[in-house]
């Protein structure tokens, strides 16, 4: 089962970086690591899955994966529904992105009982995630949705709160001592 999840996430990660390629070609080098949001989230998760296959945990990558899988999974769902609301149309790729990104968020939550990160790992993931918001919305490096350009201020504000929600959810699911921890193998 882990091999299948790994393979699906690998393909999604490759497709995600391909989707960002036009924007990456125009991005200043200092921002490159922060531009491809969703594929970077699944990239973190790929390393978590590889660690699981070796019967290990990778706490910092687990924290980064959970926070960013939830955040960017839900963000992409919201953006595609916003495109539909603004334009009245959504191509089939938009529906594919809704399904695949919702699955990203769900898999982060489903695997969270196996994660072993601490408050400090989560704090680092929180700084990464909030810093990414700053890069996206203060330096205009956010994913390019030209039909939504009139709403960037509101999208940026909502994205900040989505980051806070994702960080809080990760705290509740993993760091909180009340949660049951599971072993994968």
UniProtKB/Swiss-Prot annotation:
Keywords: Cell membrane, Membrane, Transmembrane, Transmembrane helix
Membrane disposition: Multi-pass membrane protein
GO cellular component: a single term: plasma membrane
Parts of the chain that traverse the membrane: 32-52, 66-86, 155-175
Protein's UniProt keywords contain Transit peptide: no
Disulfides per UniProt: none
Classification via Pfam families: DUF1405
Location in or out of the cell: Cell membrane
Domain of life according to the entry: Bacteria
Main localization of the protein described in the UniProt heading: membrane
Protein's UniProt keywords contain Nuclease: no
Protein name, entry field: Uncharacterized protein YpjA
Gene that specifies this protein: ypjA
């Amino acid at each position: 089962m882990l091999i299948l999840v790994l393979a699906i996430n690998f393909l999604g990660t490759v497709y995600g970086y391909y989707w960002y390629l036009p924007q990456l070609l125009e991005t200043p080098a200092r921002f490159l690591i922060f531009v491809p949001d969703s594929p970077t989230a699944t990239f973190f998760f790929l390393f978590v899955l590889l660690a699981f296959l070796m019967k290990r945990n990778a706490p910092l990558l687990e924290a980064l994966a959970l926070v960013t899988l939830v955040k960017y999974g839900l963000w992409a769902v919201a953006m595609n529904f916003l495109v539909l609301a603004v334009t009245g149309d959504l191509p089939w790729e938009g529906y594919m992105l809704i399904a695949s990104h919702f699955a990203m968020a769900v898999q982060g939550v489903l695997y969270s009982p196996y994660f072993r990160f601490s408050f400090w790992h989560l704090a680092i993931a929180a700084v990464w995630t909030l810093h990414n918001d700053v890069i996206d919305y203060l330096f205009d490096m956010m994913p390019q949705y030209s039909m939504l350009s009139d709403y960037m201020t509101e999208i940026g504000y909502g994205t900040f709160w989505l980051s806070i929600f994702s960080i809080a959810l990760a705290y509740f699911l993993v760091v909180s001592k009340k949660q049951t921890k599971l072993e994968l193998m």
